[in-house]
């Protein structure tokens, strides 16, 4: 039996304009459409495939999704549940606002401690809003578990997990004894689309809501005021312009060179 927890995150849609708030320079999540991060969809899909493969062999496992976020993050939870996850845990506390990756990793590690029987934690390699790529490793360190990161394949058998990590130097095969924490990249799979039946079933699935107090995290351990890293100054990116039009009357090449020099490109 493999009980899997998948870390998911609601992020601003990459097709929307993303910006920081004027006050504390944190990501303005209300200014853009919010979606379940695509890499998390792949993480959920991988967990479901492991569960389904084991079910063929008569092994019963479960898939739980875990997220930290505001009330709006429920939308991402329901998406994962509609794909086929069994239940969810939602760490919802205003004290988490502005937390850096270390604080987020600590809170999620504590939340994982409330989920009994966890044998495998699957996460995406990095979120599209922060692009830090370190939270899975931080969680593994806090929990004292082996970490296999940036995997393109996963295989679970005999109480062990094996996966391939592709780098510029080559492809490496990694192995660890469960329980373990892994992160996957975009090559791991193609996530399924939720069926109508799955969407309807998701509305009835269990979602446990936790606060910081319930996972044993003090308010002075997380949040923007206690973060080890924060944004101090933000400058909006310049508006797009139409550019400069060059009419070639025999000296087009010279005009292009002059333009590039003026822009300090060459």
UniProtKB/Swiss-Prot annotation:
State the source organism's domain of life: Bacteria
Q: Which GO terms describe its molecular function?
A: electron transfer activity
Q: Does the keyword Electron transport apply?
A: yes
Q: Name one Pfam family in it.
A: ETF
Entry keyword annotation includes Hydrolase = no
InterPro entries given for it?
ET-Flavoprotein_bsu_CS, ETF_a/b_N, ETF_b, ETF_beta_N, Rossmann-like_a/b/a_fold
Q: Which UniProt keywords apply?
A: Electron transport, FAD, Flavoprotein, Transport
Cofactor binding: number and manner: Binds 1 FAD per dimer. Binds 1 AMP per subunit.
User: Which cofactors is this protein said to need?
Assistant: FAD; AMP
User: What GO cellular component entries does it have?
Assistant: cytosol
Provide the assembly information: Heterodimer of an alpha and a beta subunit.
* Family designation: Belongs to the ETF beta-subunit/FixA family.
The UniProt function text for this chain reads: The electron transfer flavoprotein serves as a specific electron acceptor for other dehydrogenases. It transfers the electrons to the main respiratory chain via ETF-ubiquinone oxidoreductase (ETF dehydrogenase).
Q: What is this protein called?
A: Electron transfer flavoprotein subunit beta
């Amino acid at each position: 039996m493999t009980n899997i927890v998948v870390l998911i995150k609601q992020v601003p849609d990459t097709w929307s304009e993303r910006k920081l708030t004027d006050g504390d320079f944190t990501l303005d999540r209300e200014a853009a459409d919010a979606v379940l991060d695509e890499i998390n969809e792949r993480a959920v899909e991988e967990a479901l495939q492991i569960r389904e493969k084991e079910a063929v062999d008569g092994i019963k496992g479960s898939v739980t999704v875990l997220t930290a976020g505001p009330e709006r993050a429920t939308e991402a939870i329901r998406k994962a549940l509609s794909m086929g996850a069994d239940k969810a845990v939602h760490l919802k506390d205003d004290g988490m606002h502005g937390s850096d990756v270390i604080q987020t990793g600590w809170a999620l590690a504590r939340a994982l401690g409330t989920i009994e029987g966890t044998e495998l934690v699957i996460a995406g390699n990095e979120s599209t809003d922060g692009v830090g790529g370190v939270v899975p490793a931080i969680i593994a360190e806090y929990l004292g578990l082996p970490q296999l990161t940036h995997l393109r394949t996963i295989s679970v058998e005999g109480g062990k997990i094996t996966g391939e990590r592709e780098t510029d130097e080559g492809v490496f095969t990694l192995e660890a004894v469960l329980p373990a924490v892994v992160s996957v990249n975009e090559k791991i799979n193609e996530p399924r689309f939720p069926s109508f039946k799955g969407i309807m079933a998701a509305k009835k699935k269990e979602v446990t809501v936790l606060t910081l107090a319930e996972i044993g995290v003090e308010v002075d351990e997380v949040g923007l005021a206690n973060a080890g890293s924060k944004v101090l100054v933000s400058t909006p990116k310049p508006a797009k312009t139409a550019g400069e039009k060059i009419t070639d009357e025999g000296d087009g090449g010279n005009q292009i060179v002059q333009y590039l020099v003026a822009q300090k490109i060459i």
